[in-house]
């Protein structure tokens, strides 16, 4: 099982989503799946990212709610970088 490593930005994003009334249990469920190194369901649309986020992966918690993460297999860490809407995370 991987150990989570949360960026400061991820912590801020998490708090913002909580204040906005998002169902955080949906995010927590995806994080648990990733920590156990199990495959995500196709509805999460897990995919590698490009550009500024090259080397990271993105998945959908809901239609306009994404999680940006990276797995460091050498250190057995799940690095949680960002979460929020597409605009929050990617500025688009």
Predicted regions, residues:
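Basic nucleic-acid-binding interfaces
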Residues: 2-3, 7-8, 43
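Enriched for short, Lys/Arg-rich terminal
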Residues: 3, 16-25, 29, 59-66, ...
């Amino acid at each position: 099982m991987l150990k989570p490593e949360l960026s400061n930005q991820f912590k801020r994003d998490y708090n913002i989503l909580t204040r906005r009334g998002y169902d955080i249990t949906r995010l927590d469920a995806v994080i648990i799946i990733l920590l156990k190194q199990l495959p995500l369901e196709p509805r999460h649309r897990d995919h590698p990212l490009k550009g500024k986020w090259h080397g990271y992966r993105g998945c959908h918690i809901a239609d306009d709610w994404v999680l940006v993460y990276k797995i460091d297999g050498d250190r057995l860490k799940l690095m949680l970088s960002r979460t929020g809407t597409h605009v929050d995370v990617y500025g688009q």
